[in-house]
Structure formats: structure tokens, C-alpha cells
Design a protein with these regions (language model features):
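Aromatic-lined carbohydrate-recognition surfaces of secreted/lumenal glycan-active proteins
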Residues: 96-101, 161-191, 247-259
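Active-site-adjacent "subsite" loops/lids of carbohydrate-active enzymes
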Residues: 32, 43-45, 85-86, 96-131
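Aromatic-lined substrate-binding rim segments of carbohydrate-active enzymes
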Residues: 67, 71-100, 151-177
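Glycoside hydrolase catalytic-domain groove-lining segments
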Residues: 209-256
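Substrate-binding cleft of secreted/luminal carbohydrate-active enzymes
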Residues: 247-296
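Catalytic domains of carbohydrate-active enzymes, especially glycoside hydrolases
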Residues: 49-72, 131
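Boundary/entry segment of secreted carbohydrate-active catalytic domains
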Residues: 26-53, 57
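Active-site groove signature of glycoside hydrolases
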Residues: 121-155
């Protein structure tokens, strides 16, 4: 019942949040090219912090940024956040509030804390209608808790889906899209478990990590082929046996430690290999903080 009740919100989320609009034709979808920004308050305190982020996004083809938000940063950094959003919007880059939790799959105080955080983003948008967040990006990771570890252990999934739907309910009134990060482990569920997950939100981001490492002796060609094969495999695994219009689109995320300087090339590989897959929505890069660290 909770899944069907959420369907009334899908249209606006799909239209506004799945893709950006191409300059080559009105309504033509182009893949998402996302970027995580952690410790946003620290980054934005730097001289030209917001401008440097904007310049990086333009140079690397990033069209949306997931900006980490804590209750403290929401209150103390409101002006800097509004400035950043305005700057990125001026360059046609979407901005989503990145909210994290390891426990929000559990009803009660943990989920309540996450929902209060979402309400804070809604209030921010009401105060800053010209510099509003475009969406909520969830990083809810119950699999990090000891009781949820182990192959095939997905007992937390119903609670995770409930958390996703609860966030959508709060975000819908402010026309905020909602997306979430997921791990490969969730794609190994049975048909009903995958249906539950893939009908909970319009878009999910698969964290496709640890396929390769700069120190494992693989050359760029080998890394590329491994990524091409794995990305197709996991897209097939996610949607096997499922059909219907209300299934989430999938963004695939890669991280800097796995590829180093080859990361931009690997991200391009994802688009080249999967652009004809109707379930593929683009890629996301983890993270801007890694870039800043490497540049020091």
C-alpha cells in the first residue's frame, strides 16, 4: 500500500529530477552527471570556494551537485549555501541537499530526525525562493550497522523503503525531487525485494565501488572493459523480471580512489556503454573533496 500511495508523486519527480534538459532540443534528456560535496561548510569557507566548485563543474561536465547539509550548517551557513545555489543555477547546474543517516530505516527518533532535516530544507526553500534546492539526495546506510552485515541480509530493506517514502511525502509539498544512494548488495534481493526498492523513488544511485584500483596492475584498457561489463551486469541484475513505468532510473557512481586520474575516462565509459539502456540515467562522481585533496 505504501508503494502505490507514493505513485501520485512520481510525475513531477520524473520530469524534474531524472534528467537535465539538453541545449540541443527542448525536452531531450541528457544523462545526469553528478558530484558529491562533503563538508560543505569547510569547502565554502575557502577563498572563492563556491566559484572554484562552479568552475570545476563546468570543466568536468557536472550538471548536478549533492551538497552535504547538517543541522548546524543549515543554520550557520545559510547565506553561503544560498550564494552557492544561485551560482550553480546560473550555470544550469542542479543542487540537491545531501542528507545522511545510518539509522533512518528504523521508525521513531532516527527517522524523525531525518524528516526534521528534510523539513529544514523545505523551510530554506521558502526563505530563498530564488536560490532553492532542487531536490533531496539521501545517503541512508543501514547496511553499515553490524546486525545488517553479511551476504543476503536484507532484513532492513522494508524500513529503508519506508524511510524513502516518508521523505518523499515531506518533500512533495515543496516540489523537491528525491533520490538515494544504494549499494550492490540491494540488487541481489529477490524479485519482490527489488520491486519494493525500485518503485520507492524515481531515481537511485548505485555505488559501483572497488572494481579496480590504481595499484592492482591493470592498465586503462583493462579497467575500461571491466567497468563496461560490470555496469551492464548490475543494470541487468537490478531490473531482471521487472517491468512497468514506475521503476526507478539508475545512476552509476564511481569514486576517485578506484581510478585516480583515470576517473573522467571511466565516467565517460559508463555513458558510452549504457546510453541505450532505458534504465540508465547517467553517472555520479565521488567526490569533489577527493579532487581538492589531490590538488593540495
Amino acid at each position: 500500500m505504501r508503494i502505490f500511495a507514493a505513485c501520485v508523486w512520481i510525475c513531477s519527480g520524473v520530469l524534474c529530477g531524472l534528467f537535465s534538459l539538453s541545449a540541443f532540443g527542448e525536452g531531450t534528456p541528457v544523462p545526469v552527471h553528478g558530484l558529491w560535496l562533503w563538508k560543505s561548510a569547510e569547502v565554502l569557507e575557502r577563498p572563492r570556494g563556491a566559484d572554484s566548485l562552479r568552475d570545476f563543474c563546468k570543466a568536468e561536465g557536472i550538471n548536478e551537485v549533492y551538497v552535504s547539509i547538517s543541522a548546524q550548517s543549515e543554520e550557520q551557513e545559510e547565506g553561503r549555501l544560498a550564494h552557492l545555489i544561485g551560482l550553480l543555477h546560473h550555470s544550469n547546474i542542479r543542487v540537491e541537499a545531501l542528507l545522511s543517516s545510518a539509522d533512518a530505516d528504523e521508525p521513531g527518533k532516527h527517522r524523525g530526525k531525518l524528516l526534521e532535516h528534510v523539513r529544514g530544507i523545505v523551510q530554506f526553500n521558502q526563505k530563498h525562493p530564488a536560490e532553492r534546492f532542487d531536490g533531496i539526495h539521501l545517503d541512508v546506510e543501514p547496511q553499515q550497522r553490524p546486525e545488517n552485515k553479511g551476504p543476503g541480509n536484507l532484513k532492513f530493506l522494508p524500513g529503508l523503503v519506508d524511510a524513502f517514502l516518508a521523505v518523499r511525502a515531506v518533500a512533495a509539498a515543496s516540489h523537491l525531487t528525491v533520490s538515494a544512494d544504494i549499494q550492490i548488495k540491494l540488487l541481489k534481493g529477490d524479485l519482490n525485494q527489488r520491486r519494493m526498492l525500485l518503485t520507492s523513488l524515481p531515481r537511485l544511485t548505485l555505488m559501483l565501488y572497488e572494481l579496480s584500483s590504481p595499484g592492482n596492475g591493470e592498465n586503462a584498457e583493462q579497467m575500461t572493459e571491466k567497468l563496461r561489463t560490470a555496469s551492464g551486469k548490475f543494470l541487468d541484475m537490478a531490473y531482471q523480471g521487472l517491468d512497468g513505468r514506475n521503476l526507478a532510473k539508475m545512476v552509476i557512481a564511481l569514486r576517485t580512489p578506484d581510478y585516480g586520474e583515470l576517473l573522467p575516462q571511466m565516467l565517460k565509459t559508463l555513458d558510452d556503454a549504457n546510453r541505450t539502456n532505458l534504465h540508465y540515467a547517467g553517472w555520479a562522481r565521488h567526490s569533489y573533496n577527493d579532487y581538492l585533496k589531490a590538488a593540495q
